[in-house]
Design a protein with these regions (language model features):
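N-terminal glycine-rich phosphate-binding loop for ADP-containing cofactors
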Residues: 1-210
Length: 210
């Protein structure tokens, strides 16, 4: 392709510095991560990385605004911004299965999001994705290790949005504390490390994950 042709990837987790490390003209390349379903979900992460031409990042942000998308500027780290929130939300949910069912966990999660983690995992066939992305994040620490159950379960037995399983108050409190703990832990880390701005993080969570 021409040296001035823009090249982007829709990867959700691999840093641009790894994807494009052998590209001759690195300045015209970056990651633009869409969220499913892309025809409906407006959020797009636009990744700023060391080799990207700032004018390219600015142009892509303008282009997405002009086409009805919402660009969210993110630094070039493992899993960027929103996958760090979503993947670890799902991973923590799986670690809760020693004390609650998938339906109970999704019911409590429904107080905060439209659909619980297990319903979304079924929809996206996301179990292998969590294994891959959290294994990748283990470069930052053992605490990101994916729950082993993701390797042995194909489909979760859960409840759809708007439906609820019976959950006793003690169990509901434990689920709530763990899920919110994951959400706040990742959010604070993202802002503290300047992976993204607090405003883009909040907007992205509402649009892409809410």
């Amino acid at each position: 392709v021409r040296p001035d042709a823009l090249i982007t990837s829709n990867t959700s987790s691999l840093p641009a510095s790894r994807l494009f490390d052998r590209l001759e003209h690195k300045g015209r390349a970056t990651v633009t991560h869409f969220f499913a379903p892309a025809f409906r979900n407006p959020a797009v992460e636009v990744i700023r990385w060391a080799e990207a031409d700032p004018e390219v990042v600015d142009y892509l942000s303008w282009l997405f605004c002009a086409t009805g998308k919402v660009p969210l500027l993110t630094e070039d780290v493992l899993c960027f911004m929103l996958d760090r929130v979503f993947d670890n939300w799902c991973n923590e949910a799986a670690y809760l299965l020693d004390r609650a069912t998938a339906g109970e966990i999704d019911t409590v999660a429904g107080d905060y999001v439209h659909a619980g983690p297990f319903f979304v995992l079924n929809l996206a066939r996301g179990n292998p994705i969590i294994v891959e992305t959290n294994t990748l994040q283990m470069e930052e620490g053992e605490h990101y290790r994916p729950a082993s159950i993701f390797r042995s379960v194909d489909t979760w037995k859960t409840v759809p949005p708007g439906k609820a399983a019976a959950v006793d108050a003690t169990t509901a409190g434990q689920i709530r504390d763990r899920l919110l703990g994951s959400l706040f832990c990742q959010s604070v880390d993202i802002v503290d490390r300047s992976i993204a701005s607090a405003s883009d993080l909040e907007l992205g969570c509402c649009l892409a994950l809410g």
